Regions:
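Active-site entrance/lid segments in N-terminal catalytic domains of soluble metabolic enzymes
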Residues: 1-300
């Protein structure tokens, strides 16, 4: 079936005629397949005497050329061109993608490592795991991805605050530079501690070393992450010796999150909001806050 489809002579209007090196014409099924999967280069569709063919121009020159009928052009469609390019630099990724956490280690070390090696940020599913298990995951992932992006989930645990505190302590101890904050109904001292402990004054401004991606489904929670840390949590962190006074002062100039993941109705617990309504609402809220404060938080 595939062979007959590929050999079909398309009745498409000719865009023009072009000279193509004979050696670069792909007219076999496996060659066509390889060309169409190459998203990083433009692919030219040709109506050759033998049927549909493709051509990816190279830098080489050849005297053995055939004049071909050009019927279409597939432009570059590299995944690296999709999304907000501003996501890639701070998160050290190739792609503006984030693979969110799945609890109890379902988003495993192996998954985080495999995606990280391809330049994609993924979160380890730390929710539901004790701090010692999280520590083992940190060590394994850091060994495999010494210079690559990765993140760890930080889930709000109102009934077991020790788990939230223990996770943050491990993240700070091992230098985990990005957490995905989920299930928060409000900010807590633990998430504020993680964020603010990574603030430093530099000649160029404020350096943020601890990144936060907040997964939210309610606008009132989104607002908490789009704005700076509240004074009451900063005071708690200062009283416990978790942050310095300088870091508390710097916290007034940065939002709590670098990125928001808008969580619409899905297979797990959500607030049953359809994405077509929730996403524009979150974007509107972000824009309103940015108009009043010099912050830039990405939303996806």
């Amino acid at each position: 079936m595939k062979e007959s489809v590929l050999r079909y002579h398309p009745r498409l209007p000719e865009l023009g005629r072009t000279d193509v090196p004979r050696s670069e014409i792909a007219d076999q099924p496996h060659e066509l397949h390889a060309h169409l999967l190459n998203l990083d280069q433009p692919v030219y569709l040709l109506n050759s005497p033998d049927g549909l063919a493709t051509w990816i121009p190279s830098q080489t020159t050849s005297e053995d050329q055939l004049t071909q009928s050009l019927i279409g052009i597939l432009p570059v469609q590299s995944p690296s061109l999709l999304g907000d390019s501003g996501f890639c630099q701070p998160h050290r990724t190739r792609y503006a993608y984030h693979a969110g956490a799945m609890a109890n280690g379902i988003a495993s070390e192996e998954l985080v490592i495999a995606l990280g090696q391809q330049g994609i940020l993924a979160s380890f599913g730390a929710a539901g795991l004790v701090p010692s298990r999280i520590e083992a995951a940190i060590q394994k992932i850091q060994q495999a991805l010494p210079n690559r992006a990765y993140a760890f989930n930080l889930i709000h645990s109102p009934s077991e605050p020790a788990l939230e505190i223990g996770a943050v302590e491990r993240y700070l101890q091992y230098g985990v530079r990005c957490v995905e904050a989920s299930a928060f109904l409000d900010l807590t001292a633990s998430i504020v501690r993680y964020r603010v402990a990574g603030l430093h004054q530099t000649n160029g401004g404020i350096e943020i070393t601890n990144r936060v991606i907040a997964k939210v489904s309610r606008t009132e929670v989104a607002r908490r992450f789009l704005e700076p840390a509240p004074e009451k949590y900063l005071k708690q962190c200062l009283d416990k010796g978790w942050i310095t006074q300088e870091q508390a002062n710097l916290a007034a100039h940065v939002p709590m999150a670098d990125d928001l993941t808008v969580e619409a109705d899905s297979g797990g617990y959500t607030d049953n909001s359809p994405l077509v309504i929730l996403l524009p609402t979150m974007l509107k809220l972000r824009n309103e806050i940015q108009a009043a404060l010099p912050y830039s938080t990405r939303i996806g």
